Swiss-Prot record:
One of its GO terms (molecular function) is phospholipid scramblase activity. The record marks D354, G355 as: Cleavage. Changing T356A: Decreased phosphorylation; does not affect the phospholipid scramblase activity. Changing G248T: Does not affect ability to promote phosphatidylserine exposure. This is XK-related protein 8.
Length: 401
């Protein structure tokens, strides 16, 4: 097997293994936190963690099942029967099965001297779905739970060891999910080269530094006004949902699924930027950044005016504002640096070893298998590359949604 193909296959296996370990680690950490809260008599905190965990799991399995049923039956001929897959999703094990199946696909190709184009393309197809589901899971479950834990810490004035573990792992996990999703989208467009190490590091850092202050601002407001944070969330969520509806998204195979997607995207936009439609993205990204920044400033200012520079728990609000502001502007600077100098937006035509996937060369024959979901998102994210990318209509003709 050529070295480049072997590296591609090995990467799929590693991604599948990391996804499985991350899923299990998050589950163990959540259940550990629930047990600790119950032992401390904090039943409301334990219930909130379980509610967040449950609703995220249900939505994740629902997305996974809708995508499976939308795909042609012959595409997943190596998977389990449809009734058994339905049972796995009902038991909340659909995402875990996807990770295991993706890793199995990669391992099976490791024993082939020269994997076929179809096998390599199918491995990419599975990896793209896993990356999208992991991103959804990060914002449906990890981000709200991280906000809850930070609010608890701010209320109590101290953090237990399991809380510090959850906070650090959640911040890193969410930022990694954003990076992995961004990298996976580039495999859908022939004119987009893959991210290098320096570009990946800067992309990871600016997402971490911009997301952190936003979550901390919401957590601060939640700690000070625990009965009003739900009203704040639903108010902004409705505004963001209306904004998404105006953009006319077309991601899911039917209208009901599309509204589920819009509801989920509105939740993600409450915390971070996510491009949901085609066209030039810079204007929408700037509008969203100003909107979220203004809202975060309003949340912090309200907490400051009502409680002064010290929270009832004894934590210095001035210290939190200083650190959060520094992180935000550093993250904003890194974001500008990334898109000005490190964003690989040029078109290139590399020499490829025979038998490799050939995703980046516009002169190679079209792939036999396309992930239409990821291709649509990639065309939205990389608007300039859409003209050189595989057209959505051509993807549909290939029979893969």
């Amino acid at each position: 097997m050529p070295l480049s193909v072997h590296h591609h296959v090995a990467l799929d296996v590693v991604v599948g293994l990391v996804s499985i370990l991350s899923f299990l680690l998050d589950l163990v950490a959540d259940l550990w936190a629930v047990v600790q809260y119950v032992l401390l008599g904090r039943y409301l905190w334990a219930a909130l963690v379980l509610v967040l965990l449950g609703q995220a799991s249900v939505l994740l399995q629902l997305f996974s099942w809708l995508w499976l049923t939308a795909d042609p039956t012959e595409l997943h001929h190596s998977q389990l029967s449809r009734p058994f897959l339905a049972l796995l999703h009902l038991l909340q094990l659909g995402y875990l099965y996807r990770c295991l199946h993706g890793m199995h696909q990669g391992l099976s190709m490791c024993y082939q001297e020269m994997p076929s184009e179809c096998d390599l393309a199918y491995a990419d197809f599975l990896s793209l779905d896993i990356s999208m589901l992991k991103l959804f899971e990060s914002f449906l479950e990890a981000t709200p739970q991280l906000t809850l834990v930070l609010a608890i810490v701010l209320q109590n004035g101290q953090a237990e060891y399991y809380q510090w573990f959850g906070i650090s792992s959640s911040f890193l996990g969410i930022s990694w999910a954003l990076l992995d999703y961004h990298r996976s989208l580039r495999t859908c467009l022939p004119s987009k080269p893959r991210l290098g190490r320096s570009s990946s590091a800067i992309y990871f850092l600016w997402n971490l530094l911009l997301l952190g202050p936003r979550i901390c601002a919401i957590a601060l407001f939640s700690a000070v006004f625990p009965y009003y944070v739900a009203l704040h969330f639903f108010s902004l969520w409705l505004v963001l949902l209306f904004w998404i509806w105006l953009q006319g998204t077309n991601f899911m195979p039917d209208s009901k699924g599309e509204w589920l997607y819009r509801v989920t995207m509105a939740l993600i936009l409450y915390f971070s930027w996510f491009n949901v439609s085609g066209g030039r993205t810079r204007g929408r990204a700037v509008i969203h950044l100003i909107f979220i920044f203004s809202d975060s400033v309003l949340l912090v200012t309200t907490s400051w005016v009502t409680h002064g520079t010290w929270l009832p728990s004894g934590i210095s609000l001035l210290m939190w504002v200083t650190i959060g502001g520094a992180c935000f502007f550093l993250g904003l600077a890194l974001r500008v640096i990334y898109y000005l100098w490190l964003h690989p937006s040029c078109s290139w035509d590399p020499d490829l070893v025979d038998g490799t996937l050939g995703l980046l060369s516009p002169h190679r024959p079209p792939k036999l298998i396309y992930n239409r979901r990821a291709t649509l998102l990639a065309e939205n994210f990389f608007a300039k590359a859409k003209a050189r990318a595989v057209l959505t209509e051509e993807v549909q003709l290939n029979g893969v949604l």
